[in-house]
Amino acid sequence: MKLACLGLLAALLSWPQVQPLQKAVALSATQIYISPDAHSTRMGQVRPGEVIGVQDHSGAFTQVFSGVSGWITGHDFVALDAPGADEVIFGAAAALEAEAQSDSSDTQTAQDAARLYLNLYGYLPQSPRAGEALYRGASIQWQLKMAEEPRRRTPEERIFPDDSLMRKVINKFKDTPWAARAEYQLLVEHFTCGDWFSKPDCIGKEVGRYQDYVKKYPRGPMSAQAAYDAVYREGIAWTIYSQPGKLQNQGKTDEYARKVADDSARLLQDYPHTDWAARGALVAFQVAHHSPLKLPGSTPLGGP
């Protein structure tokens, strides 16, 4: 009996040990084949950013697991533990993001870019790229969902998609350019007061939101634009209140003329040599010369 047990133990020790799968991230869309042969049955497809398990190699083929076990050609993936993996993943995401931006209808490529960014953050959170990757992935997803929302007749009816990832950027990466960018994008969630042309008081509320943002992020990457957004709205309010009709109000006209002059001067002082400072100066010039600003066809959702 003792000899039998020793024999069984020796057999178990000599049995090939199952190696854990090496985790990797796909960098491009790749077909999965049932065998290491490009003419064999296709089992599915791996999308950029998907995490795969590398099992084995056979010539130019790699056996992977991604929901199903199969074979892919080439080396369009990077192991998560490879040196510089974060830079490679970020580079692939940035390339796809640029491609998607050149064709706004290409939502699949944009989703692939977002997946790469978000998995970089999720699997390599200590990377110097992690904060930016989380922001860029979250921003792409939020913008895609925003584009899917039906157009609302009035600002009061606006509905916004889930912003939890954007909020995660703001909370986890405080005082970074990525938090500043995320918070600027989410300012529009506050713009549900009403239509500018029936409720011009709502313009003042939007001005306040932009000015509060600039106070919070005085040197942020979006601060000059936010300061201009406020001046532009002040110019629009001046235009609406100065025109003949039921909304004409000389007191409000004078008030907004002063605000445009003061805030455009501050914009020029705080953010010199920027397009936003120059555009603010143009608004101030138009108001000073009693030249109404061109009114938009409808109340915009953020921005100038």
Give the ranges of each region predicted by the language model:
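Short, structured beta-strand/loop micro-motifs enriched in basic residues and often containing a Trp
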Residues: 28-37
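Boundary regions of SH3-family modules and the immediately adjacent low-complexity/disordered segments
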Residues: 20, 36, 41-44, 51-53, ...
